Amino acid sequence: MNNSDFKILLVDDEPDILEFVSYNLRKEGFEVQTADNGESGLKKAKEYIPHLILLDVMMPGMDGIETCDQIRSTSKLENTLIAFLTARGEDYSQVAGFNAGADDYITK
């Protein structure tokens, strides 16, 4: 699979993070979509069917843990990889992320 065939959804409420990370992923040839909150991230995930979702934990409204849980309960997204990309590095936050169905947990 070429990078251009690999679809990534980036979900973060910080515009600077969305811009920086999506720019660098696109520069490497990946197809990238973005969402600025959990609700729009879930909606885009259902429409876009990405291979990978990079998800922030701390977001207003539906946080990343709930978003991950909702994604995992959507059958057409069962093969999508989910990695939290977040400033929260505490053990309890990582455990909550993995319990919600995350495949990886990366601290910013």
Predicted regions and their residues:
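Charged docking surfaces used in two-component/phosphorelay signaling
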Residues: 19-27
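Receiver (REC) domain active-site loop signature in two-component systems and cognate sites
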Residues: 59
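Short hydrophobic/Thr-rich beta-strand motif most characteristic of the beta2 strand and flanking loop
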Residues: 29-36, 44
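Active-site beta3 strand of CheY-like receiver
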Residues: 48-54
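Acidic catalytic/metal-coordinating carboxylates
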Residues: 36-40, 63-66
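Short amphipathic alpha-helix used as the core "switch/output" element in two-component signaling
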Residues: 43, 65-78
